[in-house]
Amino acid sequence: MVKSFLEKLKASKPVAQKDRILIYGTAGIGKSEFAANFRKPVFLMSQGETGLLKLMEYGSVPEIPFFEFRNGPGKHNAIDDYLTALDDLATGQHDHATVVTDVFSGIVEMLRQKVLHEDFKGDDGKKEGGFNHFGAGAEKMMAKIITEFLPRFDAINSKGMTVVLLCHSETKLIQNPEGADYMKYITAMPEKIHNRIVNWADMVLFCKSEPILKGEKAGFGDKMTYKAVGENRLIRTVDSPASAGKNRHGLPSEIEMGSSGTEAYQNLVAALKESKEKKTAATAAS
């Protein structure tokens, strides 16, 4: 007997899946080392990214499988190789548990170059036929992100792997309709692509450094002055006026990164475990 929709609805249970994670931050904050500590990672590197190679060279992380996608002179087909690699990871037999793109903002720039040269013949002008004619190029890029990139990430995720996208950061002026405008950290990607990836991700983690200040009284009137004597490296897990963020796990708003990528990963795992235990206890008590 065929079950009705309502019978299927009542019988359905959520299937646990690994997370889709966007990690971004300032240069040198430790994004690659952080991601290298995820379970059984493989790194897909955009052209010119050397962070993982330096970490392996100096023994900061163990040897990790990687591939750099590089365009040859006058060529723009490396982005196709990247998409093929995603397909192979989604369908092939392997023991990788985490797929890291380092950095996805670099992959997006490679996509921009491909669209610019193949769809607009290298014309980045604002006149008709140009990449920047009423956002024509950005729209083509966005369409490819939606139809070619996200489905592949989801296919990898459905196979039981964690998807991690690393991005560089930049600041953006936010026009505030209720008060003064302000600056906010976001990913270094076109705004629409940034928004789409943030909506898609389960976690958006902003890695930042805050100075540790020491105050001293000096000069006329014992005026208080401050100097930096160290730094705190933090992972911000929620959205705020200062930075884009998100999580679906009830994480604290900030998690200590510690002094290494290993510490950062261990602290994230501990925070996830604590959050899950709190939810379980709350459910049992209700």
Which role fits each region the language model picked out?
Residues 172-286:
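Conserved GTP-binding G-domain of TRAFAC-class P-loop NTPases and closely related GTPase folds
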Residues 1-15, 19-22, 266-286:
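Glycine- and charge-rich intrinsically disordered segments
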Residues 2-6, 11-101, 105-113:
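Conserved P-loop
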Residues 84-87, 91, 151-155, 202:
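Surface-exposed alpha-helical segments enriched in charged/polar residues
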Residues 103-193:
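P-loop NTPase motor core
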Residues 41-43, 163, 204-206:
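Short, well-ordered beta-strand core segments
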Residues 32-35, 155, 196-197:
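Hydrophobic/aromatic ligand-binding patch that stacks against planar heteroaromatic rings
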